[in-house]
């Protein structure tokens, strides 16, 4: 299990954060697939592998390792995020060899369409920065498809710095966070 401390369980009125458990796996996978379908219907290929049954981030294994966090309202799954304290093979391919010791890797941030438009995505991202503490980690890194202007704009508004593009078409962002 990963060493972390949840500093703030509440992220908004009635929404709370907690580590995912094995029993959450099916609903999390369903949320991610529905999000991939929603993205596809809007012309994006982000997360398209999920629609083919491919899960490069191994949701179930990541839950077992303590890397997946759910956000619920009245026990209903509202959002999910994966926070890796060490880079995956995917992250190493995108980011190269530098800066891994002090980085958290954020993946699979998804909000249920039922809760869309309430600023929940921004609150989950803020929670990843300040609502949970990973010892000795001073930055969050994330990637997204290069053709999503809305997502790029969102990350920049949230204070993430564009770090460049990977040869395979992914944009890289990172943000410094306070380590205690």
Curated annotation (Swiss-Prot):
Record key words, sorted: Acyltransferase, Transferase
EC number: 2.3.1.-
Family: Belongs to the acetyltransferase family.
Matches recorded under SUPFAM superfamilies: Acyl-CoA N-acyltransferases (Nat)
Gene designation per UniProt: yesJ
Pfam families: Acetyltransf_1 (PF00583)
Signal in keyword set: no
Domain of life: Bacteria
A single MF term (Gene Ontology): acyltransferase activity, transferring groups other than amino-acyl groups
High-level lineage: Bacteria, Bacillati, Bacillota, Bacilli, Bacillales
The protein, known as: Uncharacterized N-acetyltransferase YesJ
Stretches assigned to the N-acetyltransferase domain: 31-180
């Amino acid at each position: 299990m990963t060493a972390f401390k949840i500093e703030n369980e509440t992220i908004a009125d009635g929404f709370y954060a907690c580590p995912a458990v094995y029993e959450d796996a099916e609903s999390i996978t369903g949320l991610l697939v529905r999000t991939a379908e929603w993205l596809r219907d809007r012309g994006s290929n982000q997360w398209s592998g999920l629609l083919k049954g491919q899960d490069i981030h191994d949701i179930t294994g990541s839950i077992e390792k303590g890397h997946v966090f759910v956000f619920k309202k009245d026990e209903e799954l509202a959002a999910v995020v994966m926070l890796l304290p060490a880079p995956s093979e995917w992250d190493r391919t995108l980011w190269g060899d530098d800066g891994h010791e002090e980085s958290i890797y954020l993946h699979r941030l998804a909000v249920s369409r039922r809760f869309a438009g309430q600023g929940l995505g921004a609150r989950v991202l803020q929670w990843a920065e300040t609502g949970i503490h990973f010892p000795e980690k001073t930055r969050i890194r994330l990637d997204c498809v290069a053709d999503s202007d809305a997502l790029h704009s969102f990350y920049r508004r949230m204070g993430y710095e564009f770090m460049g593009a990977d040869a395979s078409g992914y944009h890289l962002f990172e943000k410094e966070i306070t380590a205690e």
